[in-house]
């Protein structure tokens, strides 16, 4: 789905596709690999109280393992986009972008989603007038969004789902954006009676122990 989402965004520029991409990245791709023994799995149960069954490194190998490894290369794939004289920040992920056409480097520093902010530092060979736009995600509290440039409050224009700051940028300029998250109940896409609780783009889950969680790791019959 992320491949399709990527192509639809590149064709339309619709920010809504990046909302979906972000949600899938954090809640599906990130959790598709077991953090302890490295097993992989695609299937993500939507039913309350259910769990995943991961592969085991030495006894299981199926499509979830082979193509599942590729998924984790997507963390850096859609962080940025660009138009003429405009850099677009779609994902709030620590990263470094070298924009060779403009002789500029952008360093994004963030602990999102643990902290509700991100910081972008620009390095450039010479001053450059251009736009820097940040995605306005569906989950954000717009009334509390704030920007600062070099520590001073800055105004950003919200257009077509993006906050934009346009100015003449100097080497070392830094942009800070607050990312105020909200807690909400979201009905599942099938319009069933099931809801997920989300904080920002993150689906919340509770540790319910391991009772009756048999077969969390697949055996060699699969």
Enumerate the predicted regions with their spans.
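Aromatic (Trp/Tyr) and acidic
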Residues: 1-136, 144, 158
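A general beta-strand register signal
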Residues: 98, 146-148, 198
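Short, isolated positions in well-ordered beta-strands
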Residues: 104-106, 154, 204
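Short, flexible surface segments
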Residues: 141, 171-172, 199
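Solvent-exposed beta-strand/loop surfaces of large extracellular or lumenal domains
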Residues: 142-167, 185-190
């Amino acid at each position: 789905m992320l491949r399709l989402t990527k192509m639809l965004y590149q064709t339309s520029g619709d920010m809504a596709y990046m909302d979906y991409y972000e949600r899938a990245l954090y809640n599906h791709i990130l959790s598709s690999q077991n953090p302890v023994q490295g097993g992989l799995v695609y299937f993500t149960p939507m039913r309350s109280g259910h769990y995943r069954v991961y592969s085991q490194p030495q006894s299981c190998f199926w499509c979830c393992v082979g193509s599942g490894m590729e998924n984790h290369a997507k963390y850096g794939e859609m962080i940025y986009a660009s138009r003429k004289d405009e850099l677009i920040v779609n994902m709030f992920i620590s990263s470094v972008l070298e924009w060779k056409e403009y002789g500029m480097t952008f360093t994004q520093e963030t602990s999102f989603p643990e902290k509700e902010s991100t910081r972008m530092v620009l390095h450039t060979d010479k001053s450059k007038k251009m736009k820097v736009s940040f995605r306005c995600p569906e989950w954000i509290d717009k009334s509390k969004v704030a920007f600062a440039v070099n520590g001073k409050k800055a105004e950003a224009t919200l257009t077509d789902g993006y906050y934009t700051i346009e100015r003449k940028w100097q080497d070392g300029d830094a942009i800070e954006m607050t990312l105020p998250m909200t807690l909400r109940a979201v009905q599942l896409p099938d319009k069933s009676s099931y809801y997920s609780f989300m904080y920002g783009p993150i689906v919340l889950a509770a540790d319910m122990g391991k009772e009756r969680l048999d077969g969390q790791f697949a055996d060699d019959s699969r």
